[in-house]
Amino acid sequence: MKKWLCAASLGLALAASASVQAADKIAIVNVSSIFQQLPAREAVAKQLENEFKGRATELQGMERDLQTKMQKLQRDGSTMKASDRTKLENEVMKQRETFSTKAQAFEQDNRRRQAEERNKILSRIQDAVKSVATKGGYDVVIDANAVAYADSSKDITADVLKQVK
C-alpha cells in the first residue's frame, strides 16, 4: 500500500511538473516526519491503550484459563473417565471458539479505532499544509517521499509542524 501510494504520488508529481510553469511556486513537506513528531500521536496511543485495556485483560484471562484446561486435558486425559474427558474436551472447544471470536472482534475494533484517530491527525496535518501553502503563496506542495531531490529552501515541514502543534 505504501509503495503504491509513493508510486501514485511520484506519478502525480511528474504529471504536475510537466504542466507547471516557471512562475509556479513549489514546496516540499514531509508528512510522515510531522506525524511522527506530533505529541498528539503519543496521547492518542495512550488513550487507545486505556480504551482497550479492559478487553485485553479479559482476553488474557480467557487465554490463561484455556491453556490451563488444555494442559489438564493433556496431563490427565488418559486417566479420566470417558464422560469427564469428553465434557472437558467440549468445554475446551467452546472456550477456544469464544476466545477466537472475541480476539478477532478486539483486533478489528482496535484497528478501526487506530485508523480513525490516525485519519484525524492526518486531516489536521493536511489543513496545516493548506494554511502554510496559502500564506507562503505556494501553488504546489509535494510530499517529500515522492521527490528525488529538492532544495531545502523549498521544505515547509517545520512551518507545518509549528502550525499543527
From Swiss-Prot:
Residues 102-113 are annotated as: Lipopolysaccharide binding. Its main location: periplasm. Pfam families: OmpH. The keyword Transmembrane helix does not apply. GO terms for biological process: chaperone-mediated protein folding; protein stabilization. InterPro entries: Chaperone_Skp (IPR005632), Skp_dom_sf (IPR024930). GO terms for cellular component: cytosol; periplasmic space. SMART domains: OmpH (SM00935). It is found in: Periplasm. Keywords: Chaperone, Periplasm, Signal. Residues 1-22 form the signal peptide. GO terms for molecular function: unfolded protein binding. Coiled coil: none annotated. Homotrimer. Molecular chaperone that interacts specifically with outer membrane proteins, thus maintaining the solubility of early folding intermediates during passage through the periplasm. Belongs to the Skp family. This is Chaperone protein Skp. It comes from Yersinia pseudotuberculosis serotype I (strain IP32953).
